[in-house]
């Protein structure tokens, strides 16, 4: 049985910079990962001072078509489109042969 096809590059229009925790309370130097997809879920706040925050969402990183792809640990920071997000969860999605197909990062 053949593995799953990679996520098409045309569906991966975004880029991000990943900073993993350095073990000393800070973050390591940023690593660029291009050809990812950021799907934002924006929350609205009605407090008279602001209408919306940067939101949260999911980042899809393809194992083959995302340049610089790696398994991003929870607790890392990712910068996408001028906003910085915390990686709350990294879910590894495998094909039928047990190889990594893509990762889904839950960010907030």
Language-model features, listed with the residues they occupy:
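N-terminal intrinsically disordered, low-complexity, charge/repeat-rich segments that act as generic
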Residues: 1-13
């Amino acid at each position: 049985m053949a593995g799953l096809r990679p996520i098409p590059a045309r569906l991966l229009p975004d880029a991000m910079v990943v900073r993993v925790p350095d073990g000393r309370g800070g973050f390591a130097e940023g690593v660029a990962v291009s050809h990812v997809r950021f799907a934002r879920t924006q929350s609205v706040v009605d407090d008279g001072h602001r209408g919306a925050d940067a939101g949260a969402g999911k980042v899809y990183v393809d194992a083959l078509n995302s340049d610089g792809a790696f398994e991003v640990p929870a607790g890392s920071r990712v910068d996408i489109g001028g906003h910085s997000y915390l990686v709350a969860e990294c879910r590894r999605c495998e094909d039928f042969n047990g190889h990594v197909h893509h990762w889904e990062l839950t960010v907030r």
